[in-house]
Each structure stands twice: as structure tokens, then as C-alpha cells.
Amino acid sequence: MVPIRPALAPWPRHLLRCVLLLGGLRLGHPADSAAALLEPDVFLIFSQGMQGCLEAQGVQVRVTPVCNASLPAQRWKWVSRNRLFNLGATQCLGTGWPVTNTTVSLGMYECDREALSLRWQCRTLGDQLSLLLGARASNASKPGTLERGDQTRSGHWNIYGSEEDLCARPYYEVYTIQGNSHGKPCTIPFKYDNQWFHGCTSTGREDGHLWCATTQDYGKDERWGFCPIKSNDCETFWDKDQLTDSCYQFNFQSTLSWREAWASCEQQGADLLSITEIHEQTYINGLLTGYSSTLWIGLNDLDTSGGWQWSDNSPLKYLNWESDQPDNPGEENCGVIRTESSGGWQNHDCSIALPYVCKKKPNATVEPIQPDRWTNVKVECDPSWQPFQGHCYRLQAEKRSWQESKRACLRGGGDLLSIHSMAELEFITKQIKQEVEELWIGLNDLKLQMNFEWSDGSLVSFTHWHPFEPNNFRDSLEDCVTIWGPEGRWNDSPCNQSLPSICKKAGRLSQGAAEEDHGCRKGWTWHSPSCYWLGEDQVIYSDARRLCTDHGSQLVTITNRFEQAFVSSLIYNWEGEYFWTALQDLNSTGSFRWLSGDEVIYTHWNRDQPGYRRGGCVALATGSAMGLWEVKNCTSFRARYICRQSLGTPVTPELPGPDPTPSLTGSCPQGWVSDPKLRHCYKVFSSERLQEKKSWIQALGVCRELGAQLLSLASYEEEHFVAHMLNKIFGESEPESHEQHWFWIGLNRRDPREGHSWRWSDGLGFSYHNFARSRHDDDDIRGCAVLDLASLQWVPMQCQTQLDWICKIPRGVDVREPDIGRQGRLEWVRFQEAEYKFFEHHSSWAQAQRICTWFQADLTSVHSQAELDFLGQNLQKLSSDQEQHWWIGLHTLESDGRFRWTDGSIINFISWAPGKPRPIGKDKKCVYMTARQEDWGDQRCHTALPYICKRSNSSGETQPQDLPPSALGGCPSGWNQFLNKCFRIQGQDPQDRVKWSEAQFSCEQQEAQLVTIANPLEQAFITASLPNVTFDLWIGLHASQRDFQWIEQEPLLYTNWAPGEPSGPSPAPSGTKPTSCAVILHSPSAHFTGRWDDRSCTEETHGFICQKGTDPSLSPSPAATPPAPGAELSYLNHTFRLLQKPLRWKDALLLCESRNASLAHVPDPYTQAFLTQAARGLQTPLWIGLASEEGSRRYSWLSEEPLNYVSWQDEEPQHSGGCAYVDVDGTWRTTSCDTKLQGAVCGVSRGPPPRRINYRGSCPQGLADSSWIPFREHCYSFHMEVLLGHKEALQRCQKAGGTVLSILDEMENVFVWEHLQTAEAQSRGAWLGMNFNPKGGTLVWQDNTAVNYSNWGPPGLGPSMLSHNSCYWIQSSSGLWRPGACTNITMGVVCKLPRVEENSFLPSAALPESPVALVVVLTAVLLLLALMTAALILYRRRQSAERGSFEGARYSRSSHSGPAEATEKNILVSDMEMNEQQE
């Protein structure tokens, strides 16, 4: 139990709240305004144009000329879901729907009003404020074009008292710990005890721990968690190892991605777990004892230029990989520790959600990392040895094994090289190693496997592994380490390999030893090949340039990570200061250049830098952001500075620079394009097929396999060409048509050791930027960048999203052919309607499929014995080993375990080897075939095998079949009709369950046959008929010669196999009797219900489904066709209503709520099947009540039911912040919530549904004998049964205090149409409150506002209908508007009035006139007062009796979420309530 302050028992608590509200009081804890002033994320919004600050005044908003930072009504902060919260009003800024067609109301609204009108983009907020508050709007750029110059489109508005724009104080997700929300982020603000909290709070807790709710309203959902805090101790929530002084936090109950887990640890001043010693591994294993879990640790391979590393910068010297790990390092870049393998490590896909372990050292939460020592004390060395920092070094050019190299070093008085810092690595790389490709160093794990140590016995404090290394540490042949490549990266290698080596030994201290100055002036510090000096005066940028020039030098330039490390060491002791560099964007183009004009080849930006503004000069930060680069105002910001003076010829050779500059005259490969002014060629990889889209790391791999890189952009000119290329391919239509069409580019911040700094994957310096000025709550986990086709700007994105991408290759470079070997280059071999190519070179399954797609092919599918024999004959010719495995296209996904072919064709043929396939599990499976036996097996997809590609002119994908004809006729009693077929389920009595052939015979006796299922619609009908079936059912699908077919040889066009199926006994290659037959599963597992499985035809008995055609002599059943829109539909315990209108997701929700419903919840496969019939019958996708929060891929139901059953299409959900719909094939897909679909499904509530979109005021009850329906800001009364003339309609609505219907936008028209459509039989239409104004020559509504939206039906509105004698109406069947005469015709009536406060509906004479009634009222009042007094007395007594009797919160490491979740369910459980339960 998590204890808290006392809570009242339910009835006195609610009564007391009523009493206090009546008395003008409220329960709660007022915020501490003094503390709020210190909040760094709170700000005032200042208007440059109006010279004032934005202030909340009640429900209104105004600009006041007096800015007051202590006034809560002027204090704002960004909160969850891109909302703007006011501390004084404790509400969110929003817009209401227009009361007239010309005004939109800007005001303060309750933050739980789930509407897009509360969400703002910081980049456009200023423009919208100017527009809505009546000021002159900022000039906006033309849509679809690139912006140049200053990107600050909100320049009229900024944060008061600074030059910061409105994007400068963003909101970041805060991940909870413990509680009952599985680590889900806080929802800010949240409501607790009828009070809004805009941050974490200790309210309600006696122990003072900060907590937050993870849904909007704690009182309703009771979902919560503790907030992360940075502290210098390890008291609450941490386990401490007394031996090492390290602290550990095990978050077993959380489920986060690796990057989310890393962010959660960072928010506590910690990092993900690193394990650097055997003792530490043993200690962790002890804490894991008794638990069953897989947890994230800090091990990662996210640096595309480096190898495995710890996220906290610890050296990677101890390893505990499980056998065969790491595998697939190209795509699975994050490490886990597993209890099942006694603490063994595996690498996983970083995007999956898992528990995690944090680690920290006490008193080390904000200390900057100690820099390397760069001073060079003068020492004496023997001839041929070179000095550096007190040691001597020598290259041994003779190639020897590692052991022989070590002995040679020992003979010289030294040992093999040990490296302890970036400074030492730079010296070795630049001066000793030089042009030698690979050399031995002293690192090895010869003494103890997986534990690397230096041969000279020194401590391993620094590692610098090569990409994908260390990788073969398990193999005893790879126990020794080499240094190789221009950056000096390390690789583990066999110790018997013959290589040169480097020796190291201590130098002899010279007499009067002093630091070498290499000719630098006094006070200057040398670092090859320059002298450096710190200017201690704080000056603006131009003065810093002048002062360096006066000293015969320039402001410092930084060209590689070694120079960066050196400069950071110079400024280490200057806490809180900034130092100018030579980097600047003086022309405000968004492109940074060194003052020398040199290209920027290395960058080291701080978080959120270089920001959104154009222009500025770059300074180095200090403190916890030591050495990181930030953009500052060149003319107003004051900083210290660093001068650099070159000594001319470098004392030591320079490091190799970036790749040579490509030629302008080189040609581009076929299919690649360029511009005469650019040195690279470009290619867009885009596909409509979701399977061919890639994650960021997959897209990078594809580009690199071609010898190219993911797109990097160094200038506006280069990006302008890319934009032109995209417009040429996809068209220059309005941005809306390109919405959410994104392309991966090479920009990323995946590497945790770089903090949150953006880098190009090809090593190009990040010197040009074009980020869209948008913010997302989860920006911490958006580690990769995309180019947005709509805005042609960049947007951060989660790296695992599957998208298109763009590659870039230097001019004159040929696209690299895949290394496919000699036999792989054979011509394509034709068989029947397809061509096949056999590749003998070995690849993983995914890489093999990727190579096939380069030839417009897929890994082969197999659909007949003849095709299998053809493949087997060719494989026997190519395979020296007849048992060789070859990849084919059959595979499963991790999400559901169902087999599918890569080309989308159906599974109608199997050839499994005995014992295959293996039972389904969580891992993806891929299928191979053997050469001699021609049988299939499954194994891990990362295994490298040869493979077969197949291509054909006809697509293998089966298209959804058209609806069968709805033939006349019906079905006999006991049969269920659907379209033109009759179905009957048999086997309810166990004695009626028979073998397959007996089932077919039984059907034939009834003039029927076993069912054939031709499409998803028929499958949905059958699945929807299964809720009460408790046994499996034979269908007409069977296999006699390995290929499945229907009875009567009907073509097999559709299959619905269960996960891991078909896997039954493989039919014999020859024979006529069926040996494998299919059943429909009744399984209690939702993922198997209604799916197919293959069973032995002769050994098993089951129920069965018979099918026959309808009888023309019988009447059709009412349920014979798919559901139609409009009417209410009942299924099981649910009631639905189908909408068939063009709707956005929010519009659909509004429309459902106007029908006392909400968007539908799909709890099980039966309901899913029923809704599939609806979508298939309407031939249109339908919105459902499933959506994700802004910027998140976590999807949840509007009803807040758990997401236990899903029916996602492959690779879904795709969209962050998207909404879900049921497609015509029954699967769920996601898209932007602003997409217009042609329909939706409402789930009708038994009681009033919870309204997700709330508006001020309410509608009258029974006013003017009418029922009023709320919709947005208005109320509507529909009287289609009353047919009146236009004049009478006006009078009727005026009597009710409203007006005849006006329609101001498309959504309102859809709402009205939806309600008129159900009353089409009563009236053909309803009057519109519109007339012609001859003075202005325009149509106006009753309030004389112009008609700006219209929906005229053909042929439109002619001039003859624009007269005062014309009246206008809306047609019930179509929603179209029609003109007509005002007299002699009658229509239905729809009245409309604005919502008003509830007490506005009370009659003015509120007191009863009857004396008897008056006595009753007075008696009730006296009774209420007596109850109020009793409640107050009871409250005070219980409060004093229970105060102080609670235990403090405990840190719980539960191995099962169930008990802990029950314990942590409600933070408001008190001892009083427990005592009451015991009584």
C-alpha cells in the first residue's frame, strides 16, 4: 500500500464537497506561487507589435501593456500534447468553434477538452495570436517552398525579458517510476482532488514524494507513478553496492523502449546500467535472483562510426554475451540482460518495450566529465623511441604474433601499447601508427574469457572499438586486440595473426623538466600544430575577433574530435562561462562556416542546437555541457574567447581528412540525378508497399550496400535541388496532399555518448540546418530526422518508423553491385509464368530479400509440386552439399507468428521437413528449402544462406474480391443466410463430430458441401457466428498432393491461416486421398479464433460447416447482407451505428457523441469480424475509437479499455500521433487523424457516454417541447415530423429562442445531414435560415452574416434564384442545398441556438408560488443544513483520529506486475478505508 494523507469515507467526503462548494469553498492545495517563479519552463508571452504580455482574464485572453512576472495570469508553460497552460487560470489556451462565420473565439478552456483546438505548434503560435487578437499577421511563406533567411515566423511574439522565441522553453516527457502505469510519462496538467496540477506534486502524500498522474483525470482512472528526481543520495528507489558505492534501480514494472529508458535514467541523474567488472556482474545477478525478466542495459552500438559501448562512457572491457550473441548487429543495436541466462547479455531491436536498470554514483549527478590530460612533460627516450606525456613509444614494423610482439617489447624494457585517453590515442594515430593499416596493442582477454585487460597491468579506463566490435570474443582464437583504420578504432582478432605492433615504456625525467612549449609564447598552450590562448575578458563577438587579431592569431577552429577534447580541457575549470569560436552564420542562411571560409567537417552541438533561428555565432559551453557548441547573438551576448595561432608546418602529421572532394564533371549512375553545380548524385527510394519501407538503420544499410550514404545536406543550394527532385517525382500540389510523407535523411542523434547532438551519418559536419519549428513531447526519443515533403523542412522522428528514404553518392562512383559470386550472375531461368535467379553467396534473410528487390523481384514463393521440383533440380546442380539450405520467401513477423510469402501470394502449398516448423515464439522466423529433399525448415533469419529470387509480370498479391451477387432467395430453417449462400454449423452434440470425409458425406446428404471461403467478408460472417461454438470445425479445404484446394476444385483465392500454420503432417507427393484437411479454430486465444489450421483428415474428429446456395423459392433473411449505414446494429452485448460520410477522426467522434455514442471499441475477434462485414459491405475504411497520443506510437481506446486484442495489418501501427481505422480487409491501419475517410463506426452507450470533446455551457432540457442535441458550440432541435412553410419555421424557432438552421462549415453540414438522413421518410429536407440581401447582393444568414460556406447541389445556384422570393433548404438524402419557393411548399424544421450556462435555462420566478411547495422547500433546506453540520463534525473527528498513522513509501522490485499493480492501484488508499473494510 502506498500511504497518504487521510481520506474521508465515501459518503461524508462527497457530502462535504457539496457543502463546501455551496459555501464558495473547495478542497485542495493552492500552488506555491513563490516556488513557481523559479520554474525554468514558465514564461511570459510578449507581443512586439502590441507592446504587452498575454494574460488570461477569466475565460478570455487579452494583451496587457503591464508585464508582471509574479502575476500567475501572465505565466504560461508548454504541457503535454502541445498545449499551453496558464498558471493563473489553471486552464489551457484554445479556440472555440465560431459563433458566427467570421469570428473564432480565443480563450481559456479546461485542459481535458480533448480537441485539436487546444493544441498549438510553437512555430505558428505567434502568427495565430496576432490573427486571433486582431493584430497584423506575420508574413507567411508560400506553402511548399523552402524558407530562406530568418525562420522566426513568430517574430512578433517572444518570451518576455529575453530574445528567446516561443519554442525556446519546450515540454519534455517525464517518465514515471513505480506506481501502476508501467513507466508511462506523466500527463501534464492532470486533475487530482478537483484541482489541476501543472507539474509533479507531493499533495496527498505524507512522505513528501513527488508523483503525477499518467492520464488526464486521476480521480477517474487512478493511473499514476512517482516522478524522477536528481539527488545526490541513493535512498528511495535505489539498491546500493557498499563495496563499489554504485547504486542500482530495477524498473521491473516499466515497459519502455531503450531510448525512453535511457531518458528515464537521465532524468534521475543516472544512466542505464553499465557492467565493467566481474564483481559487478555477480552483484547484479544476486539482485536478479528470483525474477524472470529481460531488461535494458546501457550497452549499445548506436554510433554508426564506432563499436559497442556503454551509454555512461564507461570502458567496454568486460563482456557477458550469451552464445551466438550479438547477432544481426546492423539492426539490433541495444543490449539487454536476461534472468533466464543468469545475467547473460543479448542484443535486441532498440524500439521494443522492456523493463530496465539504472545506475548512478552518489554525489555525481552534475559533475562534468574530467577531461584528458594534454600537458606534455619533457622526458628522455632511447633512440628510435618517441616521447609523449611521460612515456616513450616505438613502432615495431616486423610482423609477429601477439605473444611474439609482447616478448619483443619486453626485451626492449617495455610492453605492448596501452591507451588511456583520447589525447594518447591522437598521438598514437598521428605520430606512431601513421600509414600502417593495422597493429597489435596490449589489450587481451587471455587470462579470463570476456574480461579484457592491458598486458602491462594498467587499468582499462578507455576503449575505442571499431563498428560491430568486439564481436568474436567467445572464440578462443580472438583474444587479442588490434588498432586499425584512420581513427584508430580497435578490433579483437586471433592472437596468432602476424602484424606490426607498438611498444610503450616509462620515460626518464629530464633535468629541470618542464612542459614543452614548442615555440608558443608565455601563457599560450601548445597542441600540434598550433598555440592556444584563453581570453578572459567577456566581450561581444566582433571584439573577440579583433582581440585575437591583435595577438597575431584567429578565433579557434575545431576540425576533429581530438582537437575538441583538447579545447575542452583548456576550459574545464571555467564553470558557467562561454567561449567564442570562429564558427558563425553571419549571413543568416542557416549555413555555418568558419571565419577562414573552410567547410565544417566536424561539429559538437549541445542539445537542441543550433536551434531554429537563422544567424548567430557559436560559443563553447562549460560545466555539465563541457565543450558543447551553442549559438549566441553575435552583437549582444558577451563571452570569453579562445585564440589559435598556427605555427606553420605541423610538428606531427595530420590525421587523414574526410573523403576526397568529388569531381563536378563525374557522371551519375543510371537512375540517379544531380545538378551541374553539385558534386553528388541522388536517388529517392519510395514505395507504396509497406513491406519495402525501412527503419532509419535499415535505410542506412541499403544506401551503404550501394556504395552510397543516406542523404546529408551541406547548403541551401543542395537542399533546393533535392526539393526540386521531389516535386518532380511527386508533384507540386498543396502541402496537405503530401502530409506525413517523410523521407529518411542521414541526420541522427542516436549515439548516447554524444548527448543529444545531431550528426550526419556520413561524417559531414552538421553546419546547415532546416528544422521545422515544431516540438514534440517525446523529442528525447526522436533520434533520427526526416525530410517532410509537405513543408520541405526537417522533422525529428523515432528511428524505428518504416519510411521512404533518399541516398547520395559521389559523382563518378559506380553503384556497388551486390557481392553475389560467380553463380549468382547467371541469367534468369524461366519456368511457367515466372523467372528465377539463384544466388550462391550467403546473406541473411532480410539482406537476401533486399537484393531481390533490386531486380524487381522477391524471395521465391512456391505454389505447386512442379514448381518445387523445378527449384530442387536447379539447387542440386548448384549445391556441392546436397543438404545445403537456401532461403525462400516464407516468413513470420514478430507481431503475430503467421506465415506469409514476401510477394503477398497466398499459402496453398507446403513441404515441411519432419519436425518442422518449430513451435511459434516471439522471434521472427524465416524458411529455407534443401536441395536434395526439397523440404522446408525454419531458423533464425540472421543466418547467412544462399537464396532464390523470383519475379513475374503478374503480382502475386491477391486483391480483395468483389462482393458476391446478392441473389434472390432464402435458406431453409436451421440455416443462416449470407448474401447468396446458406451456412449451417454442425457438431454441437459431441456424437456428431466426425472425420473430414464423413463431414463431407453428411453435407452431401443435405444437398450441400463443406464450406468454401472465398474472401474476407465470408470469413468475417463465419467468425462472427462462433461466439458460442466450443469446438473446431472442418471446412472444404484439403491437400492430397501437398497443394491445398477446395472441394469441387474451386480456385483458392483467400486464406486465413493461424500463427505457425499450415504445419500439419505434410501430404505425400503422390496420392489422391486427402491427408491434410483444414479446420476453423474456436480457440479461446483471440489471435487464433476463426483462423485455419491443417489437421489429419483421417485421425481427428471435429464439427463442420455445410454450405449451399440460396433457394429462389424462399424469402431472403433480413440479415443476409452486410450492415447498412444509419440504423442501429446489435451484436452480442454491443450496439453500433455506421456512419458513411467524409469525416476526419475528430469529426467522427463529434458525430458519434451527437448520437449518444462514441467511436467503437473492438474487444475481441468476434466483434472485429462483425465490423469487418460493415467495412467490406460499405467498401470503405471506417474510423474506430483507437488513437495514439500526440507524437506517440502508443495506441489506446477512447473507452480506456486495455488493448488486449489487436488486428493490425503487417508493420502497423505506423503513425506517431495517428488514428486507427478498420480497412475493407478487416485489418487495422493507421493514418493522420486529419485524413478524411468515408465512414466510421460508433459504439452506442447504454447511458450517457463520456464526452471526450467538451464545450462550455449545455443545451436546454425540454425547452419549447423539444429535445436539443449538442454539437460543438450549439444546440439543435430536429422536427422532421412537423412540415411547415418557411415563415412558420422562422416563428417556431424564434419562439424557442433560436434561429432556423444555419450551416457554417463542412463538418456542421455532415452533422445535420447525418441526422436528417434517418428521417428521410418523414421529410425530403429541412429549411435553411438563409435569405437574399439585395443591398449587398449576397446570401446572408438570419443574423445578417454572409454565407461563406455552401454545399449547393447540381446545377448550382443560378441568378434567378437570388431574390427575396427565394428560400433555401437542405436535402435529407444527400446533404446538398437546394433553392426553392418560400410558399406552397413545406419542409421539416431544425432550430439552432448557442449553448449557454445551465442556470440560464431557469425561469425567472425561481421560488414556488404554492405555500405547500414553499414548506417542502424550506424543510429540505433545514435538513440539508443539519447534514452539513454532521458531515463537518464527522470529518474533523476522523481527521484528528487518523493523522500520522501511515507507513512511508517503499521501493518495490516485484517480479510480477500483478500484485504490485494491485498494491499500487490507488494512491489514495488510507488506513481509515482499510479499517472500514475490515469492519
From Swiss-Prot:
The gene coding this protein: Mrc2
Keywords: Calcium, Disulfide bond, Endocytosis, Glycoprotein, Isopeptide bond, Lectin, Membrane, Phosphoprotein, Receptor, Repeat, Signal, Transmembrane, Transmembrane helix, Ubl conjugation
Domain of life: Eukaryota
Subunit relationships: Interacts directly with PLAUR/UPAR and PLAU/pro-UPA to form a tri-molecular complex. Interacts with collagen V and with C-terminal region of type I collagen/COL1A1.
Membrane topology type: Single-pass type I membrane protein
Chief location: membrane
Protein localization: Membrane
Annotated function: May play a role as endocytotic lectin receptor displaying calcium-dependent lectin activity. Internalizes glycosylated ligands from the extracellular space for release in an endosomal compartment via clathrin-mediated endocytosis. May be involved in plasminogen activation system controlling the extracellular level of PLAUR/PLAU, and thus may regulate protease activity at the cell surface. May contribute to cellular uptake, remodeling and degradation of extracellular collagen matrices. May participate in remodeling of extracellular matrix cooperating with the matrix metalloproteinases (MMPs).
Disulfide-bond pairs as recorded: 92-111, 186-212, 200-227, 265-358, 334-350, 409-503, 480-495, 617-634, 703-807, 784-799, 852-949, 926-941, 1077-1097, 1219-1233, 1367-1382
Pfam families reported in the protein's UniProt record: CysR_MRC2_N (PF24562), fn2 (PF00040), Lectin_C (PF00059)
Domain comment as written in the entry: C-type lectin domains 3 to 8 are not required for calcium-dependent binding of mannose, fucose and N-acetylglucosamine. C-type lectin domain 2 is responsible for sugar-binding in a calcium-dependent manner. Fibronectin type-II domain mediates collagen-binding.
Sites of the Glycyl lysine isopeptide (Lys-Gly) (interchain with G-Cter in SUMO1) crosslink: 1141
Name of the molecule in the record: C-type mannose receptor 2
Extent of the signal sequence: 1-30
Record's keyword annotation contains Signal: yes
All ranges on the Extracellular side of the membrane: 31-1413
Domain Fibronectin type-II intervals: 181-229
GO cellular component assignments: cell surface; plasma membrane
Topological domain ranges for the Cytoplasmic compartment: 1435-1479
Alphabetized SMART domains for the sequence: CLECT (SM00034), FN2 (SM00059), RICIN (SM00458)
Native species: Mus musculus (Mouse)
Residues carrying sugar: 101, 139, 363, 1028, 1348
